[in-house]
Design a protein with these regions (language model features):
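Metallocofactor- and cofactor-centric catalytic cores in central/energy metabolism, strongly enriched
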Residues: 2-208, 212, 224-228
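Glycine- and other small-residue-rich loops at beta-strand/loop junctions that grip anionic moieties
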Residues: 194, 215-219, 240-241
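Residue-level detector of conserved catalytic or cofactor/ligand-binding positions
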Residues: 245-251
Length: 251
């Protein structure tokens, strides 16, 4: 297969589902601080890790692989509460106020879009900042519009979507997940028993050409329907968990 690796040029929009959560605000704060030279990107393979070359010398991965520069990243996303990233990070109390204040202005500028949410899939949460949609298909169309609008408003060349929200309830793999046609039909028929909000986010991202990374262990991109859609659109999907067991309780 012929490789066609394009250079990472232009602005990269990173849209996070659960952008006001502890995981997201900690990640965003660290990234903003690192790109201002106020902190090191400890734990980041792309920024700190090295590769051994044929001559035996080591070079940083970011100097070899065509990756986005930290300065080109624009953060945004969705949340079930309207707090900006600074307010949300203060509430989470993962980082100290003095550390958050180093990038306070940037954090305050990150304001969430209303989330696609269903209380039945996250029973411990009661979101107040959520989308109104008659069907899962309509919910997905709203998310697609959000992605397009964010991309245009922030002059982004490309978008990636990351799920950093709470784990949804368990649902088994069903016939609606076996093919793209069946999945789309279930979304249009508003079969809320088998179509979760996370699936709506994943579908919307893929449809808009945005890679989707799943950060929770619930059923989402690990279905034949999503694999089919990913292959059809030539858009990467990945992930199953961000070790959520260490940082939050499943809902």
């Amino acid at each position: 297969m012929k490789e066609n690796i394009k250079p990472a040029t232009g602005r990269l929009g990173v849209l996070v589902v659960g952008v006001g959560g502890a995981v997201a605000t900690t990640m965003i704060t660290g990234t903003l601080a690192a790109r201002k030279g106020l902190a090191k990107a400890i734990g980041s393979i792309t920024q700190m890790a090295a590769m051994r070359m044929q001559d035996g010398k080591e070079k940083l991965i970011k100097d070899i692989v065509p990756l986005a520069d930290l300065n080109d990243i624009v953060f945004g996303g969705w949340d079930i509460f309207p707090d900006n990233a600074y307010e949300a990070a203060m509430y989470a109390e993962v980082l100290k106020e003095k550390d958050l204040n180093l990038v306070k202005d940037e954090l305050q500028a990150i304001k969430p879009m209303p989330a696609a949410f269903d209380h039945n899939f996250a029973k411990r949460l009661n979101g107040t900042y959520i989308k109104k949609a008659a069907t899962r298909w309509e919910m997905t169309e709203q998310l697609r519009e959000d992605i397009r609008n964010f991309k245009a408003a922030n002059n982004c060349e490309r978008i990636a979507v990351l799920w950093a929200a709470s784990t949804e309830i368990y649902i088994p793999l069903s016939k609606e997940h076996e093919s793209l046609a069946a999945l789309e039909q279930a979304m249009k028929e508003n079969n809320t028993e088998v179509i979760s909000p996370s699936m709506c986010y994943a579908y919307a991202a893929i449809a808009e050409g945005a890679p989707f990374i799943m950060g929770a262990p619930n059923l989402c991109v690990d279905t034949p329907a999503m694999w089919e859609f990913s292959k059809k659109m030539n858009v990467p999907i990945s992930g199953k968990d961000l070790s959520l067991i260490h940082i939050s309780e499943p809902t």
